[in-house]
Amino acid sequence: LLVRGARPLAGAATRLSPRGLSTTNKLVLTLSAGSSSIKFGVFDVAGGAPVERCSGIVEEVGSDHSRLKLVVDGEVKRDVADLHIKGHGEALANIRDALAPQLPGEIAAVGHRVVHGGASILGPALVDDAIVDEVDACAALAPLHNPANALGIRFARDTWGDVPHVVVTTCVEINILRR
Protein backbone atom coordinates (compact mmCIF):
# COMPACT_ATOMS: atom_id res chain seq x y z
CA LEU A 1 0.00 0.00 0.00
CA LEU A 2 1.53 3.26 -1.06
CA VAL A 3 0.91 6.04 1.41
CA ARG A 4 1.81 9.65 0.83
CA GLY A 5 2.49 12.08 3.64
CA ALA A 6 -0.16 14.26 5.23
CA ARG A 7 -0.13 16.49 2.17
CA PRO A 8 0.40 14.08 -0.73
CA LEU A 9 1.56 16.74 -3.17
CA ALA A 10 4.26 18.01 -0.83
CA GLY A 11 5.84 14.84 0.56
CA ALA A 12 7.74 11.87 -0.71
CA ALA A 13 5.92 8.55 -0.72
CA THR A 14 6.53 6.10 2.10
CA ARG A 15 5.65 2.44 2.18
CA LEU A 16 3.18 0.92 4.65
CA SER A 17 3.19 -2.84 4.21
CA PRO A 18 1.35 -5.62 6.03
CA ARG A 19 4.72 -6.70 7.45
CA GLY A 20 4.96 -3.34 9.18
CA LEU A 21 1.72 -3.79 11.10
CA SER A 22 2.11 -4.60 14.76
CA THR A 23 -0.31 -7.39 15.64
CA THR A 24 -0.18 -11.18 15.42
CA ASN A 25 -3.33 -11.30 13.33
CA LYS A 26 -2.88 -8.33 11.06
CA LEU A 27 -6.36 -7.00 10.39
CA VAL A 28 -7.23 -4.02 8.23
CA LEU A 29 -10.66 -2.43 8.63
CA THR A 30 -12.11 -0.67 5.59
CA LEU A 31 -14.95 1.86 5.80
CA SER A 32 -17.03 3.39 3.03
CA ALA A 33 -19.60 5.85 4.36
CA GLY A 34 -22.32 7.21 2.13
CA SER A 35 -25.33 9.42 2.68
CA SER A 36 -27.52 6.68 4.20
CA SER A 37 -25.27 3.64 4.53
CA ILE A 38 -21.87 2.50 5.70
CA LYS A 39 -20.15 -0.51 4.17
CA PHE A 40 -17.28 -2.16 6.01
CA GLY A 41 -14.83 -5.00 5.65
CA VAL A 42 -12.09 -6.59 7.72
CA PHE A 43 -9.17 -8.19 5.91
CA ASP A 44 -6.44 -10.42 7.35
CA VAL A 45 -3.17 -9.39 5.72
CA ALA A 46 -0.81 -11.55 7.81
CA GLY A 47 -0.15 -13.89 4.90
CA GLY A 48 0.52 -11.17 2.35
CA ALA A 49 -2.54 -11.34 0.09
CA PRO A 50 -5.60 -9.90 1.87
CA VAL A 51 -8.23 -12.41 2.99
CA GLU A 52 -11.68 -11.04 3.80
CA ARG A 53 -12.70 -12.13 7.30
CA CYS A 54 -15.74 -9.91 7.90
CA SER A 55 -17.93 -7.65 5.83
CA GLY A 56 -21.19 -5.89 6.22
CA ILE A 57 -23.36 -2.87 5.84
CA VAL A 58 -25.56 -0.56 7.84
CA GLU A 59 -28.38 0.61 5.57
CA GLU A 60 -31.08 3.25 5.88
CA VAL A 61 -29.15 5.30 8.43
CA GLY A 62 -31.47 7.94 9.85
CA SER A 63 -34.69 5.97 9.39
CA ASP A 64 -36.85 3.69 11.51
CA HIS A 65 -35.94 0.84 9.18
CA SER A 66 -32.16 0.78 9.57
CA ARG A 67 -30.54 -2.59 9.01
CA LEU A 68 -27.22 -4.05 10.16
CA LYS A 69 -25.81 -7.06 8.33
CA LEU A 70 -22.55 -8.75 9.37
CA VAL A 71 -20.93 -11.63 7.48
CA VAL A 72 -17.99 -13.49 9.06
CA ASP A 73 -15.94 -15.92 6.98
CA GLY A 74 -18.79 -16.17 4.48
CA GLU A 75 -21.51 -16.86 7.07
CA VAL A 76 -24.20 -14.35 8.04
CA LYS A 77 -23.71 -13.79 11.78
CA ARG A 78 -26.08 -10.90 12.22
CA ASP A 79 -28.88 -9.49 10.09
CA VAL A 80 -31.12 -7.17 12.05
CA ALA A 81 -33.74 -4.96 10.43
CA ASP A 82 -36.05 -2.26 11.76
CA LEU A 83 -33.36 -0.73 13.94
CA HIS A 84 -33.62 2.99 14.54
CA ILE A 85 -30.07 4.18 13.88
CA LYS A 86 -30.31 7.96 14.06
CA GLY A 87 -27.05 8.94 12.41
CA HIS A 88 -23.66 7.90 11.13
CA GLY A 89 -22.01 8.11 14.56
CA GLU A 90 -24.52 5.63 15.94
CA ALA A 91 -24.11 3.42 12.86
CA LEU A 92 -20.33 3.34 13.34
CA ALA A 93 -20.77 2.48 17.03
CA ASN A 94 -23.03 -0.41 15.99
CA ILE A 95 -20.39 -1.62 13.53
CA ARG A 96 -17.67 -1.42 16.19
CA ASP A 97 -19.80 -3.34 18.70
CA ALA A 98 -20.84 -5.99 16.17
CA LEU A 99 -17.26 -6.55 14.99
CA ALA A 100 -15.55 -6.70 18.40
CA PRO A 101 -16.51 -10.28 19.38
CA GLN A 102 -15.92 -11.57 15.84
CA LEU A 103 -12.37 -10.39 15.26
CA PRO A 104 -9.55 -12.96 15.46
CA GLY A 105 -7.11 -10.20 16.38
CA GLU A 106 -6.83 -6.47 16.68
CA ILE A 107 -7.33 -3.82 14.05
CA ALA A 108 -3.85 -2.83 12.84
CA ALA A 109 -4.86 -0.23 10.23
CA VAL A 110 -8.00 1.46 8.93
CA GLY A 111 -8.70 2.38 5.32
CA HIS A 112 -11.30 5.00 4.43
CA ARG A 113 -12.87 5.48 1.01
CA VAL A 114 -13.36 9.18 0.37
CA VAL A 115 -15.30 10.32 -2.66
CA HIS A 116 -13.49 13.61 -3.26
CA GLY A 117 -10.30 15.03 -1.80
CA GLY A 118 -10.13 18.12 -3.96
CA ALA A 119 -6.79 19.20 -5.37
CA SER A 120 -4.89 18.24 -2.21
CA ILE A 121 -5.67 14.54 -1.85
CA LEU A 122 -4.81 13.00 -5.20
CA GLY A 123 -3.93 9.53 -3.99
CA PRO A 124 -3.77 7.42 -0.85
CA ALA A 125 -2.81 9.58 2.12
CA LEU A 126 -1.95 8.91 5.74
CA VAL A 127 -4.66 10.60 7.81
CA ASP A 128 -3.93 13.56 10.04
CA ASP A 129 -6.12 16.48 11.12
CA ALA A 130 -5.31 18.39 7.92
CA ILE A 131 -6.56 15.49 5.77
CA VAL A 132 -9.85 15.34 7.68
CA ASP A 133 -10.22 19.11 7.33
CA GLU A 134 -9.64 18.80 3.57
CA VAL A 135 -12.32 16.11 3.27
CA ASP A 136 -14.70 18.45 5.10
CA ALA A 137 -13.67 21.39 2.90
CA CYS A 138 -14.60 19.37 -0.20
CA ALA A 139 -18.14 18.65 1.01
CA ALA A 140 -19.61 20.79 -1.77
CA LEU A 141 -17.93 18.51 -4.35
CA ALA A 142 -19.57 15.38 -2.89
CA PRO A 143 -22.35 16.55 -0.54
CA LEU A 144 -23.91 13.12 -0.08
CA HIS A 145 -20.65 11.43 0.83
CA ASN A 146 -17.87 13.69 2.10
CA PRO A 147 -19.61 14.74 5.34
CA ALA A 148 -20.22 11.06 6.15
CA ASN A 149 -16.65 10.21 5.10
CA ALA A 150 -15.23 12.83 7.48
CA LEU A 151 -17.46 11.65 10.33
CA GLY A 152 -16.36 8.06 9.72
CA ILE A 153 -12.70 9.05 9.80
CA ARG A 154 -13.15 11.00 13.05
CA PHE A 155 -15.06 8.16 14.73
CA ALA A 156 -12.54 5.54 13.60
CA ARG A 157 -9.61 7.67 14.78
CA ASP A 158 -11.29 8.04 18.17
CA THR A 159 -11.93 4.28 18.34
CA TRP A 160 -8.71 2.95 16.77
CA GLY A 161 -6.49 5.98 17.25
CA ASP A 162 -3.27 4.09 17.83
CA VAL A 163 -3.15 2.55 14.33
CA PRO A 164 -2.46 4.10 10.91
CA HIS A 165 -5.47 5.44 9.01
CA VAL A 166 -5.30 5.87 5.25
CA VAL A 167 -7.73 7.63 2.92
CA VAL A 168 -8.18 6.51 -0.65
CA THR A 169 -10.06 8.94 -2.83
CA THR A 170 -12.08 7.90 -5.84
CA CYS A 171 -11.25 11.19 -7.55
CA VAL A 172 -8.05 9.39 -8.60
CA GLU A 173 -10.22 7.59 -11.14
CA ILE A 174 -11.23 10.97 -12.54
CA ASN A 175 -7.56 11.93 -12.91
CA ILE A 176 -6.83 8.66 -14.73
CA LEU A 177 -9.73 9.24 -17.13
CA ARG A 178 -8.40 12.70 -18.00
CA ARG A 179 -5.12 11.26 -19.32
PLM feature segments, named:
Residues 135-179:
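Active-site neighborhood for divalent-cation/phosphate handling
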Residues 37-85:
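Short glycine-rich, Thr/Ser-proximal phosphate-binding strand/loop in the N-terminal lobe
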Residues 73-113:
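Glycine-rich, N-terminal phosphate-binding loop and its surrounding beta-alpha-beta segment
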Residues 31-36:
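A short acidic Gly-Thr/Ser loop motif
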Residues 28-30, 109-111, 167:
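Short glycine-aspartate micro-motif
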Residues 1-24:
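N-terminal mitochondrial targeting presequence
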Residues 99-144, 175-179:
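Short beta-strand-loop/turn "lid" adjacent to the catalytic site in phosphate-handling enzymes
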